[in-house]
């Protein structure tokens, strides 16, 4: 990680042990947003909750923690070892002049112990704290409201069935800041005013905004807006948000409710009300009834980020306006005098249209973040849709079942859109897994049917 003229300081990042594949792209994206750069020299074990990062300044470390939902805390690393002896030797080699500002006689402090994959007794904790008496602490201990908090962190490995007596790694550092994990609870869809069948989990919603490097005063667009869950996380970070959807009832908050024990939506159940619930209404631009396959926007770059979750045909239908002779027409009332005719929308066409739209309407350096449904037995990296104007940044998997998953794809616009890119259909081979309406849907439910049949057979034995 580089920042011109700045010496790099080592920091310890403590991460939450969920959504493991999503953590590195989130931290990398946020560091670049803060003006840093993630280098291959970082001391990172992808599945470990402890990462050592080289960051130019404490302010950049704080900036990272003001955004991340994957990390719990960050510490200025004073010592690290594979044994207690190595840790103490490392601490003795840490420059005293860097320690002293936090060890003054008129300051207060406390020491906290955190262990991963093992629980220590209070006596064991006290013994470990007493072993640090060689450090020049001269302030007073204050357990309730200290000025400085120091942490001993111990890693006992990833196997809960084989916990070692001694830790594999030990760390000591000064606490700098906590991440934004509390947002997962405060924005939980359980408490949200307006939800749908496919409302995005709050944690994943914030991860998507971070992968998209959403920042204050950006304009963020969701072409499959649904109930607007993805707009909320972007608005929380200060972006102005808008979206479109083909379902008139959802956009206007009409029709049947998705919430249990509620038949119809209330008079104030809509996207705007969701943003109002969180004090974010000022960031709401609009939500329009529109077909994503037929863009309504004027030509030119309009959006800093496009963050979306296209329909897969499982809980929400894949539809677009128009009609097909071979398909059964469905009508949806939009105004008193106009009926929208919708037809099937192939998954291959959804992703082709989405990438083409992003290439044309994203600003240079803007990001597209979307979910790609995958039938795992057939998955290869080659089937991830590409576009000549978009660079693939990250590809993270979330399991849905033993045979299906979805992948969070993040792409960045690196080339200006030209007329010749209008129909840049990438090789047909990339889209073959999605050919035919709801091919993913059929494979998803074929797996469910097979599992049910197997369970019934096992029960008969």
Swiss-Prot record:
The gene is TRMT11. It comes from Gallus gallus (Chicken). Keywords: Cytoplasm, Methyltransferase, RNA-binding, S-adenosyl-L-methionine, Transferase, tRNA processing, tRNA-binding. It holds the Pfam family UPF0020. This is tRNA (guanine(10)-N(2))-methyltransferase TRMT11. It catalyses: guanosine(10) in tRNA + S-adenosyl-L-methionine = N(2)-methylguanosine(10) in tRNA + S-adenosyl-L-homocysteine + H(+). One of its GO terms (molecular function) is tRNA binding. Part of the heterodimeric TRMT11-TRM112 methyltransferase complex; this complex forms an active tRNA methyltransferase, where TRMT112 acts as an activator of the catalytic subunit TRMT11. The keyword Mitochondrion does not apply.
